[in-house]
Swiss-Prot record:
Keywords: Glycoprotein, Glycosidase, Hydrolase, Signal
Active site residues of this protein: E204 (proton donor), E422 (nucleophile)
Official protein name in the record: Non-cyanogenic beta-glucosidase
Chain sites annotated for binding a beta-D-glucoside: Q54, H158, N203, E204, Y346, E422, W471, E478, W479, F487
Source organism (scientific name): Trifolium repens (Creeping white clover)
Signal peptide extent: 1-18
GO molecular-function terms, A-Z: beta-glucosidase activity
Length: 493
C-alpha cells in the first residue's frame, strides 16, 4: 500500500493566497489574503486526526478483543455502503513508524488518535486481564511521535466499545459501563500519562447516541425501526446512552484530576460535534426558536450538562420523564468537568420549525421538532462534498456568528479553551481516476484555507482557540460509508 502525500501544505509552506477555485460558486469567491503559521498565535497547534477502529487494522492480532464495530460490520455487512470492514483498513498497527515519518515530513505539531479499549482490555474490564501487548503498541506509537517532535493528543473512546460489555449488560444502555470506563481510563492515565499532555474522554458522544441508538445506522445498530441490527427504543435509548456517557466522562475526569494531573501536568476534556444551525427564515420566530432548540439537542445536549450540571430547560420541557435525572452528587461531578472542549465542525444547515404530531411515537430524532435543509430558495448554502451532510460553509467562525453560537450556549469565548479537533471534507473514492487526477486537491485546499482564515478571525476577535486538527490524516474506513469516500490529507491506494 502506498501513501501519497496529497496536501496540507499549510504545515510546510510560509504563505499562499487563494483568489479563485472551482470548489466555490463564483458569486461567493473572496480574495482573503495570505495565511501562514505566523498568522496564528505562538504555540497554536496544527495536527491531523484518526481513530483506532478506522486506522489500526490488526483486529485479530496482538491480543485485541472484538469491538461492537467488528460485530456490526461482519454480522450486518449490508449496513455498510460497500459491505466492507476495518479488519485491515490502513494498517497503522504495523505501519505506525511510516505514518509518523509522513507526519514529520508534513511538519505536524500533533497527532490526534484514539486508544482501542478492547486492545487494552480484551474482556472490557480490569478483572478480565490487561493485554500488555496492546499497552506496548501504544507506548511504541507515543514514543515514536515524541521522538519526531509530534505531540500525542489521545482520545479514550471513539465508539469501539468492547463487544463483551455489549453482550454482558448492553454497553452504554447500562450504568455498569460507567465504572468499567473509569477503570479503563485509569489504566491509560497510569500507563501513558507521563507522556500525553492532552486527553479527550469521548469523541462525538452525540453521534454515538443518535446514530447507534436512534437511527441504528452505526454500531451497535439499535433503534425502534424493524430493519435494524438490534431492537431498541429510539425514544429512550439515546437519552440513557447520553446520560451514561456523560457520567462516564465525568468519572474519568475525576480520576485524572485527583490521581494524575498534579504531577503529569496534562489537560483533559471532551470532543463534541456541532453544525452551525441557522433559521431557514431569519424573520420567523418559530424558525429562530427551532434553530436554538436544535442546538440544544446536539451540541447543547452535552455542553449544557458540562457547564450547569443538568440538561437544558427546553429538553426537560420536551422530553419530560424520558430524560434521566442527575443526583446532586452526579450533577456536581459533571459540572465543570473539563479543561478544554474539542469542537468537530464540518458543515452547517438551515433549520425550520416542525410542529409535533401528538400521536407519533417518541424518538430522539423528532423530539427537537425541526426540519433540516441545506438550501434556501433553491440555493445551496455552499458546495456539497461527497457526503450529503457536508456543504462547505466556513462562516460559523465569523465573529458575529461565532458569538451568537457561544451566546446561545452561555459560553464565554474569551475564557473557555478549545480546539477544532476535526474539520474536513470528503470526495468520492473513484477507482477509475488516475492517481495524478485523484491528487488534485483544489477543493480540499480551498475548504481548509477558508476555515482557517475565519478561525484566525475568531481568534483575533477574542476566541480562545488553541489548535486545529484536520480530518483525517489518511484516507481510511469511514464507518457506515466504508471506503466509498476519502477524507484524507494523504491518498491511500
Amino acid at each position: 500500500m502506498d501513501f501519497i502525500v496529497a496536501i496540507f501544505a499549510l504545515f510546510v509552506i510560509s504563505s499562499f493566497t487563494i483568489t479563485s477555485t472551482n470548489a466555490v460558486e463564483a458569486s461567493t469567491l473572496l480574495d482573503i489574503g495570505n495565511l501562514s503559521r505566523s498568522s496564528f498565535p505562538r504555540g497554536f497547534i496544527f495536527g491531523a486526526g484518526s481513530s483506532a477502529y478506522q486506522f489500526e487494522g490488526a483486529v485479530n492480532e496482538g491480543g485485541r478483543g472484538p469491538s461492537i464495530w467488528d460485530t456490526f460490520t461482519h454480522k450486518y455487512p449490508e449496513k455498510i455502503r460497500d459491505g466492507s470492514n476495518a479488519d485491515i483498513t490502513v494498517d497503522q498497527y504495523h505501519r505506525y513508524k511510516e505514518d509518523v515519518g509522513i507526519m514529520k515530513d508534513q511538519n505536524m505539531d500533533s497527532y490526534r488518535f484514539s486508544i482501542s479499549w478492547p486492545r487494552i482490555l480484551p474482556k472490557g474490564k480490569l478483572s478480565g486481564g490487561i493485554n500488555h501487548e496492546g499497552i506496548k503498541y501504544y507506548n511504541n506509537l507515543i514514543n515514536e511521535l515524541l521522538a519526531n517532535g509530534i505531540q500525542p493528543f489521545v482520545t479514550l473512546f471513539h465508539w469501539d466499545l468492547p463487544q463483551v460489555l455489549e453482550d454482558e449488560y448492553g454497553g452504554f444502555l447500562n450504568s455498569g459501563v460507567i465504572n468499567d470506563f473509569r477503570d479503563y481510563t485509569d489504566l491509560c492515565f497510569k500507563e501513558f500519562g507521563d507522556r500525553v499532555r492532552y486527553w479527550s474522554t469521548l469523541n462525538e458522544p452525540w453521534v454515538f447516541s443518535n446514530s447507534g441508538y436512534a437511527l441504528g445506522t452505526n454500531a451497535p445498530g439499535r433503534c425502534s425501526a424493524s430493519n435494524v441490527a438490534k431492537p431498541g427504543d429510539s425514544g429512550t435509548g439515546p437519552y440513557i446512552v447520553t446520560h451514561n456517557q456523560i457520567l462516564a466522562h465525568a468519572e474519568a475526569v475525576h480520576v485524572y484530576k485527583t490521581k494524575y494531573q498534579a504531577y503529569q501536568k496534562g489537560k483533559i476534556g471532551i470532543t463534541l460535534v456541532s453544525n452551525w444551525l441557522m433559521p431557514l427564515d431569519d424573520n420567523s420566530i418559530p424558525d429562530i426558536k427551532a434553530a436554538e432548540r436544535s442546538l440544544d439537542f446536539q451540541f447543547g445536549l452535552f455542553m449544557e450538562q458540562l457547564t450547569t450540571g443538568d440538561y437544558s430547560k427546553s429538553m426537560r420541557r420536551i422530553v419530560k420523564n424520558r430524560l434521566p435525572k442527575f443526583s446532586k452528587f452526579e450533577s456536581s461531578l459533571v459540572n465543570g468537568s473539563f479543561d478544554f472542549i474539542g469542537i468537530n465542525y464540518y458543515s452547517s444547515s438551515y433549520i425550520s420549525n416542525a410542529p409535533s404530531h401528538g400521536n407519533a411515537k417518541p424518538s430522539y430524532s423528532t423530539n427537537p421538532m425541526t426540519n433540516i435543509s441545506f438550501e434556501k430558495h433553491g440555493i445551496p448554502l455552499g458546495p456539497r462534498a461527497a457526503s450529503i451532510w457536508i456543504y462547505v460553509y466556513p462562516y460559523m467562525f465569523i465573529q458575529e456568528d461565532f458569538e451568537i453560537f457561544c451566546y446561545i450556549l452561555k459560553i464565554n469565548i474569551t475564557i473557555l479553551q478549545f480546539s477544532i479537533t476535526e474539520n474536513g471534507m470528503n470526495e468520492f473514492n473513484d477507482a477509475t481516476l488516475p492517481v495524478e487526477e485523484a491528487l488534485l486537491n483544489t477543493y480540499r485546499i480551498d475548504y481548509y484555507y477558508r476555515h482557517l482564515y475565519y478561525i484566525r478571525s475568531a481568534i483575533r476577535a477574542g476566541s480562545n482557540v488553541k489548535g486545529f486538527y484536520a480530518w483525517s490524516f489518511l484516507d481510511c474506513n469511514e464507518w457506515f460509508a466504508g471506503f466509498t469516500v476519502r477524507f484524507g490529507l494523504n491518498f491511500v491506494d
